[in-house]
Amino acid sequence: MDPTVGWIALLAFFVVSIALVVWGRNGF
């Protein structure tokens, strides 16, 4: 498995979790 794939998955997970937190705070 390419290490880059792991980094992309980790980054995507981080971005999604941040987006969900911001989204939740805005009351959507």
Curated annotation (Swiss-Prot):
One of its GO terms (biological process) is cytochrome complex assembly. It is a single-pass membrane protein. GO terms for cellular component: cytochrome b6f complex; plasma membrane. The chain crosses the membrane at residues 2-22. Signal peptide: none annotated. The keyword RNA-binding does not apply. It is found in: Cell inner membrane. GO terms for molecular function: electron transporter, transferring electrons within cytochrome b6/f complex of photosystem II activity. Keywords: Cell inner membrane, Cell membrane, Electron transport, Membrane, Transmembrane, Transmembrane helix, Transport. It comes from the Bacteria. Belongs to the PetN family. Component of the cytochrome b6-f complex, which mediates electron transfer between photosystem II (PSII) and photosystem I (PSI), cyclic electron flow around PSI, and state transitions. The 4 large subunits of the cytochrome b6-f complex are cytochrome b6, subunit IV (17 kDa polypeptide, PetD), cytochrome f and the Rieske protein, while the 4 small subunits are PetG, PetL, PetM and PetN. The complex functions as a dimer. This is Cytochrome b6-f complex subunit 8. The lineage of its organism: Bacteria, Bacillati, Cyanobacteriota, Cyanophyceae, Gloeobacterales. The gene is petN.
